[in-house]
């Protein structure tokens, strides 16, 4: 994981946003974005990994504007925008669109791999397991 002032800021926002959230396996949700952040190799993708679910899960408290005001650069904000799936758009169309942003693509690959890890959910496969595999295959090969 990359250590910087910006990453520290992202980490603090992530912990505050998800402090009471529990994942499907019964673990503190903060483990997920923190795990993704450890897979990243640069400052901006680390920030995106930490923040990737903050607006989607806590849009009542956080917005792209508030993250911009907090000092996150345009490339971080753009990647975060790509990572939010509008449910009116077919999932694979969303995946194909986000593949055009290299930061979003890198974070989504790590996110999909972690979501496909059945050890996170006490051995149960994710409900969208096949779709996630298809998305991962697409991103890794395009």
What are these model-predicted stretches?
Residues 1-142:
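Active-site helical microenvironments for divalent-metal-assisted chemistry
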């Amino acid at each position: 994981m990359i250590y910087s002032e910006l990453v520290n800021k992202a980490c603090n926002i992530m912990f505050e946003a998800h402090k009471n959230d529990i994942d499907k396996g019964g673990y503190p949700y903060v483990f997920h974005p923190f795990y993704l952040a450890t897979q990243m190799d640069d400052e901006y993708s680390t920030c995106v990994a930490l923040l990737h679910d903050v607006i989607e899960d806590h849009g009542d408290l956080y917005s792209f504007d508030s993250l911009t005001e907090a000092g996150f650069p345009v490339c971080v904000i753009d990647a975060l925008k790509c990572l939010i799936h509008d449910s009116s758009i077919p999932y694979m169309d969303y995946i194909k669109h986000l593949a055009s942003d290299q930061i979003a693509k890198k974070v989504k690959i790590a996110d999909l791999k972690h979501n496909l890890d059945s050890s996170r959910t006490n051995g149960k496969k994710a409900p969208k397991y096949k779709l996630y595999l298809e998305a991962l295959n697409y991103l890794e090969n395009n």
